[in-house]
Amino acid sequence: MQPLQISAIVALVVAAIIAIVVWSIALLEYRKLLRQRKIDRLIDRIRERAEDSGNESEGDQEELSALVEMGGHDAPWDIDDL
């Protein structure tokens, strides 16, 4: 093989690896975005039910807690523990 062919093959392999890494990062960010949207919808639903009935929905709070624990993220609301 000529050096030009070898360098072309190496360039294609490097480009494929870079593409896989970029798409993997994009997929992870997209999944994080979907999880955050789901959490936001649950928070909105809890707020609406609390306004309507005067108390919060236990099922929605449990689902929200499970999502927050599953994602390993802190609570999406602000907590001031000063």
Swiss-Prot record:
Q: What is its main location?
A: host cell
Q: Which Pfam families match?
A: Vpu (PF00558)
* Membrane topology value: Single-pass type I membrane protein
Q: Which GO terms describe its cellular component?
A: host cell membrane; membrane
List the ranges whose topology is Cytoplasmic: 29-82
Please give the SUPFAM superfamilies that the UniProt record associates with this protein: HIV-1 VPU cytoplasmic domain
- Phosphoserine occurs at S53, S57
From the record, give the transmembrane residue ranges: 8-28
Chloroplast recorded as keyword: no
Q: Name one GO biological process term.
A: receptor catabolic process
Q: How is it modified after translation?
A: Phosphorylated by host CK2. This phosphorylation is necessary for interaction with human BTRC and degradation of CD4.
Q: Which family, according to the similarity comment?
A: Belongs to the HIV-1 VPU protein family.
Q: What does this protein do?
A: Enhances virion budding by targeting host CD4 and Tetherin/BST2 to proteasome degradation. Degradation of CD4 prevents any unwanted premature interactions between viral Env and its host receptor CD4 in the endoplasmic reticulum. Degradation of antiretroviral protein Tetherin/BST2 is important for virion budding, as BST2 tethers new viral particles to the host cell membrane. Mechanistically, Vpu bridges either CD4 or BST2 to BTRC, a substrate recognition subunit of the Skp1/Cullin/F-box protein E3 ubiquitin ligase, induces their ubiquitination and subsequent proteasomal degradation.
Show the domain comment. The N-terminus and transmembrane domains are required for self-oligomerization and proper virion budding, whereas the cytoplasmic domain is required for CD4 degradation. The cytoplasmic domain is composed of 2 amphipathic alpha helix that form a U-shape.
Protein name listed in UniProt: Protein Vpu
User: Which gene specifies this protein's sequence?
Assistant: vpu
